[in-house]
Amino acid sequence: MASLKRSTSKLKRDNHLYPVIMAGGSGTRFWPLSRQLFPKQLLRIMGDETLIQQTMRRVVCASAPNRVMISTNPAQAESIRVQLSEWKDELSENFVLEPEGRNTAPAIALVALELARRDPDAIMLVVPADHIIKGQRAFDAAVAMAATLAKQDYLVTFGIQPIRPETGYGYIRPNRKVTLGKQGLLKGHPVSRFVEKPNATKAAQYLKAGDYYWNSGMFVWRAAAILDEIKRHQPALSRGIERISQLMGSGATRQSVDEAYRALTPVSIDTGVMEQSKKAAIVPVFFQWSDIGSWGSLDEVAPKDKAGNVVVGRVVDVGSRRSIVYGDRRLVATIGLTDMVVVDTPDATLVCPKSRAQDVKQLVDILKRQKAPEHLEHLTVHRPWGSYTILEEGVGYKVKRVTVKPGGRLSLQLHHRRSEHWVVITGTARVTRGEEVFDLKTGHSTEIPLETKHRLENLGQETLHIIEVQNGPYLGEDDIVRFQDDYGRNIKP
């Protein structure tokens, strides 16, 4: 994979511009490839880089890496740190974690408070982590135009020219009679009207009218300005965020801060602030954009074969047309499909008409109610130290293949309800078991009894592979007590 740090831009960096990457979503409409603990932004959908890596590369053209803020949750933070490890030093203090999702307004308010404290003139460039954008220069120009308006205390959003009567996006109508600013072909206008996701008839009318734009979900504003507007239109949220800031500044326990955040009422920045503000402005932009909101969205950005099919992975097809076939690992064979979606992963397969791709969220909701593990994570789960793959599980046992990269070290931990048996397949493992520390070579094994502190690390130059067999009445990943951890995860006080 090409080094992300090599990406450069001729755009002059604004010393007061702080990109804020919103990376707390679950991407349910992209299941089964996207899972709650490994969502869409962590996937390689187009090219060699994941969506969040592409987003990071894009925004550092306008601002120094140490001014990029990441808004996410504890469950995803470690995976994001791994994917953005080239900037681990610059980003080390720039993760703002939501203990629980409360929609976009609380998350943005929390980051805005932090940035206003760091820099009274801070301008936020708020971007989702999982969008695809083509046209770096056009994006840079739009950011520069929006930042000019933000300095006048406007709350700026980017408008996307519709290419079809889409019912999955909100729409924005600018007041073209008033031009707030102009740079080249770009113009900024006050927002005349926000429209929630319309039905098909209304969407067709907006497309025909030609003066409505898709709401991109990207924003530029001064941190102080958005805090003022939140205070004006969402006073309860403003008071709650101020209270959380005070708790954090006074050294309150994490539990107290988390409880205060969970008490906030969920509210969207669009409906809660932008649609009510008199300072809302729009800059219609010229870059190619897709939020990859469903499998059907791949039609917009992915290359197609002569029959209009999007084919990814090991796929053999006979006579299909305008279909999307995604093979994660296994061979996928299709015959005579028309306008269909087929997505195969090691533990789940999706088959649906393209016209119903938005309904995948309903499937995920059913899986959540059933407490099915397939909505939560893949069989292979990535960690900062490497990964593990579930090979088999049943009542009272689970078998994993654990991979530890050179220099990787798991936390010092114990489990209350399971024991473990480790067999080294390749490499040499440094094992901590209770008071013992010893090396375990290829072909050798050891037992980790219940309630015993233990740790696994790889001091060698090659990747360490072990087979782990767990036994016990409960084998969930939450049965863990950490005492030491190299990656900043929760440890027992």
Predicted regions and their residues:
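Left-handed beta-helix
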Residues: 2-16, 223-423, 428-446, 454, ...
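Conserved N-terminal catalytic core of the sugar/cofactor nucleotidyltransferase
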Residues: 2-21, 28-39, 44-128, 132-140, ...
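Catalytic metal- and UDP-sugar-binding loop of GT-A-like glycosyltransferases, i.e.
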Residues: 22, 127, 424, 469
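Residue-level signal for inorganic ion chemistry
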Residues: 52, 111, 130, 172, ...
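Conserved core of the sugar-phosphate nucleotidyltransferase
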Residues: 135-263, 281
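Short, surface-exposed secondary-structure boundary micro-motifs
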Residues: 354, 451-452, 459, 471-472
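Intrinsically disordered, low-complexity, mixed-charge
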Residues: 457, 471, 484-489
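Noncatalytic nucleic-acid binding interfaces
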Residues: 466
